[in-house]
Amino acid sequence: MDIKTLKGFKDYLPKDSLIRIHIVRQIFSVLNSYNFDLIDTPVLEYSDLLLKKSGDETEKQIYRFKDNGGRDVSMRFDLTVPFARFVATNISALKLPFRRSQFGKVFRGENSQKGRYREFMQFDFDIVGEDTFRGDAEILSVVYYGLEEIFLNFIEGINKKFIIHYSHIGILNSFFEKLGLKEKSIFILRNIDKIDKIGIDKVKEALLLEIEKEAVDSILSLVSLQGTFKDKIQALKSILGDNESIKRVEDVFQHLSLLKIQDSFNLNLKISRGLDYYTGIVFESEVFGSNMGSVCSGGRYDNLVSSFSNSIQKISGVGGSFGVDRIKDIIDLEKFSYIKIFVTKARSKVLIVNLDSALQNYYYELATRFRNHDYSKVKNISCEVYFKNKNGKNIKEQIEYALSKEIRFLVFVGQEEYKENKMKVRDLTKKEELLLSFEESINLIKCNEKLLCTPF
């Protein structure tokens, strides 16, 4: 029997899992600074709920089946639709505006390739109950600071640059209506969203199947506008006149300028996201040189929550989603030797080398002291005792074990050290060994914490 994972699904070894969890922690730290509240929703939902606003492409990719009770269920393809259902279900318990964060796995039957899997992790963030441009700008600022935290602070030795492309569905729909193509808007939006994926020529071919050539040329000309933000806005105003959606985009840009982060944003009318529930601002983010597609995408959805219940009035929402596994793939592509452990405080790792069978109990008592020396638990040191079987293990094998787990400090206690209430501490990054008391050992390990790196 060939033992392997399903196509598009993968195992994560400890090193891979370490990178993933630190990406999650970096994103969480940014969202926490904005007061987003963490929630969770089921992986399985009723199919009719998930498919309400999914679009034809998504419907083809969804994992859908009958459960043992004969119910038509599907695995979530994103975290946005389940969140809208969550709001509709729990509206009486929520204080609006509600800031939500959530991370978890989602499932899509896509063509699997690097950066595109059938099971992958997302970290979402949304604000519901807020329909002003400030909400849009707040979400876009989260995207900026989240990517900055990951790519400019998390990774040592590289300075990854990124750009956040954004558009507005209202601007595009206004133009389609001007062309007399209002009823074709969803068809057009789904196709122009593919321009960067399959090229403008193939998109043009698809549009010509249902739309006259003159209109197609006008659409492709609009979404290909070049120049500065001001140039594009002036061009749009000359075409659409006094337009509410254009004003919205201007207000968002002014807010981003207030934060002095506007240079990382690009008004790009090719962005439409291809999902039927978006109604306003939409965005995608690109890491230069990665060729991985968007690492954080999203937009405004004003009608999604109310579509789940007739008793709920319109509740506006806007949000985005970080692609954790795609971000990890970009990190994997980089040629660097170390990844800094940043989170809140890097935890030092210690291995107590098993030297003497007569000191087994003492080793475990010592490990407990390392783990619990700080009452607040914030500055404790992760530590383990090497398991010694009946055949024993020599010191070389124990050191190799420490290196394989990227443990930095080895602690040696033989009979002589035990009698003196001392220990030898070896720093594997410096190849130095010192005879120290327990408190001195703690100080040595903690003082080196700021420089702690995990070799890969």
From Swiss-Prot:
Keywords linked to the UniProt accession: Aminoacyl-tRNA synthetase, ATP-binding, Cytoplasm, Ligase, Nucleotide-binding, Protein biosynthesis
Cell location: Cytoplasm
Domain of life according to the entry: Bacteria
InterPro entries on file: aa-tRNA-synth_II, aa-tRNA-synth_II/BPL/LPL, Anticodon-bd, Anticodon-bd_dom_sf, His-tRNA-ligase, HisRS-like_core, HisRS/HisZ, HisRS_anticodon
Any matching Pfam family: tRNA-synt_His
MF (Gene Ontology): ATP binding; histidine-tRNA ligase activity
Record-level GO cellular component terms: cytoplasm
Assembly and binders: Homodimer.
Protein name: Histidine--tRNA ligase
Organism the protein comes from: Borreliella burgdorferi (strain ATCC 35210 / DSM 4680 / CIP 102532 / B31)
Gene name tied to this protein: hisS
